[in-house]
Amino acid sequence: MTLLLLGAVLLVAQPQLVPSHPAAPGPGLKQQGLLRKVIILPEDTGEGAATNGSTQQLPQTIIIGVRKGGTRALLEMLSLHPDVAAAENEVHFFDWEEHYSQGLGWYLTQMPFSSPHQLTVEKTPAYFTSPKVPERIHSMNPTIRLLLILRDPSERVLSDYTQVLYNHLQKHKPYPPIEDLLMRDGRLNVDYKALNRSLYHAHMLNWLRFFPLGHIHIVDGDRFIRDPFPEIQKVERFLKLSPQINASNFYFNKTKGFYCLRDSGKDRCLHESKGRAHPQVDPKLLDKLHEYFREPNKKFFKLVGRTFDWH
């Protein structure tokens, strides 16, 4: 009976097929010319339910970004809360066609088993900068709570470059110096993807076409690095979670140079790939980066009604 009910729920919640560049939503959009398909979970598979009564639930909260903004740290720290069940991996359901085409039934199988009172959370930082994702998430759940962690756009660019650089080095592949990617004919290379990902104003406009600002909580990633506890408290309040995480759950690791977690007497830190040192960059190039982001940052501050301590 539970599985039959689940099939009915998924029929209602099945995401709609949308174009890569969706039009603004209007009256009757959800009813006009949409292809739906029934998702049935066979009774003999046990998919979506466990013998202990826990089930796999579609997420009620998604960490949508930003890449190299601190999404993994946010998820790990939020997972300290007993009422949170987090998906371990980046699911890439709403931005990868090979996943999205498989429907909500597939998406559900990527979620952790959880108790009815728990909040299921997944994080895929690429969602924030993907034009098609906001409408797709809205089609699944228009009242979903979204988390967005942002840091200084210039610092985020350097972190973005550093990650790709290390990925190439691990595969023994060459990768150009950051100056070669950032500069072209004496000017900033605005076609460099890492720059585009830091234009928060442009991406946020797309999300606000489908969700009110009150449904998107912005975590200050720079403050989160310096002192995570106050930012986590704000997230708890936004998600209407009881205050269970406390300052004793965090300690500063001098060797690593960032905060680690303490849970039930056990200490653990993020993967060694987190918190890598950035390459040395010419101060003049940094000045160009700061100047490039100055006006977009002002527009973003006005859009969201708050300011951040960015260059």
Swiss-Prot record:
Keywords from the named record: Disulfide bond, Glycoprotein, Golgi apparatus, Signal, Transferase
Localisation: Golgi apparatus lumen
Reactions catalysed according to its record: alpha-D-glucosaminyl-[heparan sulfate](n) + 3'-phosphoadenylyl sulfate = 3-sulfo-alpha-D-glucosaminyl-[heparan sulfate](n) + adenosine 3',5'-bisphosphate + H(+)
A GO term from the CC aspect: Golgi lumen
Enzyme Commission designation: 2.8.2.23
Keyword Signal: yes
Glycan-linked positions: 52, 196, 246, 253
Source taxon at top rank: Eukaryota
Pfam family, one: Sulfotransfer_1
Residue pairs linked by disulfide bridges in the UniProt entry: 260-269
Residues annotated to bind 3'-phosphoadenylyl sulfate: 68-72, 151, 159, 259, 274-278
A GO MF term: [heparan sulfate]-glucosamine 3-sulfotransferase activity
GO biological process: glycosaminoglycan biosynthetic process; heparan sulfate proteoglycan biosynthetic process
Signal peptide coordinates: 1-20
Function (record text): Sulfotransferase that utilizes 3'-phospho-5'-adenylyl sulfate (PAPS) to catalyze the transfer of a sulfo group to position 3 of glucosamine residues in heparan. Catalyzes the rate limiting step in the biosynthesis of heparan sulfate (HSact). This modification is a crucial step in the biosynthesis of anticoagulant heparan sulfate as it completes the structure of the antithrombin pentasaccharide binding site.
Family: Belongs to the sulfotransferase 1 family.
Designated name of the protein: Heparan sulfate glucosamine 3-O-sulfotransferase 1
Taxonomic lineage: Eukaryota, Metazoa, Chordata, Craniata, Vertebrata
Gene name of the encoded protein: Hs3st1
